[in-house]
């Protein structure tokens, strides 16, 4: 009998012994349980410094007696906090917690209890995020304070963006995060969507727009870049990286330049673009692409988000039939590709300063 088999046999024997002891103990002491299942939800993402309200429900006392509730948020709380108000099984019980100033992941644990009964518990995780760009926010790794960047403030909502000049045009170096509905002058085109429908993520990953929304979302004096603007950007990137731009075309593949547009950034200290040896991330254009993926939107269904750690996808103003041209970067390939997407696709938007 080899060592692995000995270990497996020992583990099995211990499990059988433990089960035997447990059965004998269960015969001696019966544990009483509360009725129902504890339900509470924590938002997936929250802004640092914000106040979050939680509501727990779903549990009742078998004898309709009062229930108590205590909770703990970690990191942040050294010990649990018991609520003074008795738990209401019909309407639930709500409490608030103020999120700290540091972007991080929290665990929220909730317990409902009654004398003589085993407590019912549930836990959720949530991630706090910050749009600060001074090195203490959620996105770090890009030095926007270098002399290569300028800034622009959108008068519509007061949000500011870093900009960079590349390919003879001034580009947003961050994804547009305008959250209000846009119009083509005659029709309301609706709003874009933030990542996983979390408002807290709007200023982190930007807003995901359909192509028609993207055509009208940029502030006055800025526009959705067309294929020619992207081509000029790609040619400059090729020069920066010392690769040939021969064969580059508006709707073609930009060979060997993806790293010139990618930034080696982290989200809450976790690297966004996984390392692949064939992709040399230099961000030599200052474009600062993040791996935010794309979304599929359709009618009243909840948008589905994909490839947030694998791709960066950007609309252009060019169309073909009822589709729009987009360019995309993948984590494991040095080339920038192009494709055509229908109106059910939502992607990131980089505004470029209007030529006129």
Feature roles, as predicted:
Residues 112-114:
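Conserved structural position at the C-terminal beta-strand
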Residues 108-110:
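Hydrophobic/tyrosine-rich beta-strand signature of extracellular beta-sandwich/beta-rich modules
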Residues 83-91:
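Short beta-strand segments within Ig-like beta-sandwich modules, predominantly Fibronectin type-III
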Residues 2-3, 13-48, 116-151, 351, ...:
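Bacterial Sec-dependent N-terminal signal peptides
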């Amino acid at each position: 009998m080899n060592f692995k088999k000995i270990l497996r046999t020992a583990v099995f024997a211990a499990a059988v012994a433990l089960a035997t002891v447990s059965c004998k103990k269960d015969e001696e002491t019966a544990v009483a349980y509360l009725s129902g299942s504890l339900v509470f939800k924590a938002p997936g993402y929250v802004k640092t410094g914000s106040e979050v309200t939680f509501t727990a429900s779903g549990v009742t006392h078998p004898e309709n007696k009062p229930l108590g509730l205590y909770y703990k948020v970690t990191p942040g709380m050294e010990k649990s906090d018991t609520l003074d108000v008795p738990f209401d099984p019909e309407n639930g019980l709500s409490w608030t917690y103020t999120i700290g100033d540091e972007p991080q992941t929290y665990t929220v644990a909730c317990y409902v209890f009654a004398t003589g009964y085993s407590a019912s518990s549930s836990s959720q995780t949530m991630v706090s995020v910050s749009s600060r760009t001074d090195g203490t926010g959620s996105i770090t790794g890009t030095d926007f304070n270098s002399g290569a960047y300028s800034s622009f403030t959108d008068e519509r909502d007061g949000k500011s963006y870093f900009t960079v000049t590349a390919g003879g045009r001034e580009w947003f170096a961050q994804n547009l995060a305008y959250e209000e509905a846009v119009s083509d002058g005659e029709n309301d085109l609706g709003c874009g969507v933030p990542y996983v429908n979390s408002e807290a993520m709007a200023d982190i990953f930007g807003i995901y727009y359909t192509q028609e929304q993207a055509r009208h979302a940029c502030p006055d004096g800025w526009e959705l870049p067309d294929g020619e603007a992207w081509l000029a950007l790609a040619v400059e990137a090729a020069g920066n990286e010392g690769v040939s731009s021969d064969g580059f075309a508006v709707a073609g593949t930009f060979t060997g330049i993806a790293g010139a547009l990618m930034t080696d950034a982290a989200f809450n200290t976790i690297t966004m673009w996984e390392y692949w040896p064939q992709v040399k991330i230099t961000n030599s254009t200052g474009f600062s692409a993040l791996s935010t993926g794309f979304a599929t939107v359709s009618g009243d269904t909840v948008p589905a988000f994909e490839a947030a750690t694998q791709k960066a996808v950007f609309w252009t103003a060019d169309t073909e039939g009822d589709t729009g041209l987009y360019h995309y970067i993948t984590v494991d390939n040095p080339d920038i590709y192009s494709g055509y997407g229908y109106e059910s696709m939502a992607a990131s938007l980089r505004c470029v300063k209007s030529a006129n």
